[in-house]
Swiss-Prot record:
The chain crosses the membrane at residues 4-24, 76-96, 109-129, 141-161, 183-203, 206-226. Regulates localization of phosphatidylinositol 4-kinase (PI4K) to the plasma membrane. Residues 1-3, 97-108, 162-182, 227-271 are cytoplasmic. Signal peptide: none annotated. It is a multi-pass membrane protein. InterPro entries: DRAM/TMEM150_Autophagy_Mod, Frag1/DRAM/Sfk1. This is Transmembrane protein 150A. The lineage of its organism: Eukaryota, Metazoa, Chordata, Craniata, Vertebrata. Residues 25-75, 130-140, 204-205 are extracellular.
Length: 271
């Protein structure tokens, strides 16, 4: 058992309540309408709703998409913080998971692709969190267009890798759980995209709900790594470094055995 088990749990525990707080602040500040509202108007006159209570008149601009919830201050400040801190945690989790797979299995293109997808997901999160949709729409949509598909690709590949390195019945059970979460993520992301491009009030509201389901699902998926991270040690990161060093030592036409002996001799000489 190591302290790394706290990392994926922290990402889930920090991010899920965090974005709900952002949503609650946006609703109370009349920046979006509550998710349970299904009635929208083309236009609204001055809304006389009291401060601290949800809006009574909603338009298409008030649909509670996650991006809209984090557009205006003060909730935009918390939204950016969650995006930045969450992205940093995602990168560390992806690096640890990459190293852990190498430690128990051989290097594979699936593992490398999963690492790239996870880091790309983190980069997109930074853009989404720091470029609000109403002020930098192009950059915000680029970030979302990068973060969401990359996040989906990461969970897909991670689910496959879970089965490849499974060693116990509990490992396979966790693989089944991750596949279920991946299916939910795939369906919700596709539906969110389909609904979002429609101009109907109902479709836009459904897009917001699907977007929330997707994000919450991905955060829960990251939290499942707490199970494997209990076995992370100093040898875990060294496994990735040694694998990289071994590959860099290889030269065309040289045998595997002679190459390893040559590299080991070089390391000893350096010491």
């Amino acid at each position: 058992m190591t302290g790394w088990i706290v990392l994926p749990i922290s990402l889930t525990v920090f991010s899920i309540p965090g974005i709900w707080i952002v949503y609650a602040m946006a609703v109370m500040n009349h920046h979006v309408c509550p998710v349970e509202n299904w009635t929208y108007n083309l236009t609204c006159t001055d809304d006389n709703t009291k401060a601290g209570t949800p809006k009574s008149c909603c338009t298409l601009e008030d649909v509670p998409l996650i991006s809209k919830c984090g557009t205006y201050p003060p909730e935009s400040c918390l939204f950016s913080l969650i995006g930045n801190v969450g992205a940093f945690m995602v990168v560390i989790i992806c690096l640890l998971r990459y190293s852990q797979v190498i430690e128990v299995s051989q290097r594979s293109w699936l593992n490398t692709t999963a690492l790239i997808a996870g880091c790309t997901n983190a980069a997109g999160l930074v853009m989404v969190g720091n470029f609000q949709v109403d002020y930098a729409k192009s950059l915000h949509y680029i970030g979302a267009g990068v973060a969401f598909p990359a996040g989906l690709l990461f969970v897909c590949l991670s689910s496959i890798l879970s089965y490849q390195i499974a060693a116990s019945a509990l490992d396979y059970w966790l693989g089944h759980l991750r596949v279920s979460l991946t299916i939910v993520a795939l369906i919700s992301l596709v539906l969110s995209g389909v609904f979002f491009i429609q101009e109907s009030f109902l479709m836009q509201h459904l897009a917001a709900i699907c977007e929330w389901i997707f994000v919450l699902d991905i955060l829960v998926f990251y939290g499942t790594f707490a199970y494997e991270f209990g076995s992370v040690s100093t040898d875990t990161m060294m496994a990735a470094l040694q694998s990289s060093s071994a590959r860099s030592c290889k030269s065309p036409g040289s045998s595997s055995t002679s190459t390893h002996l040559h590299c080991n001799a070089e390391r000893i000489a350096m010491i």
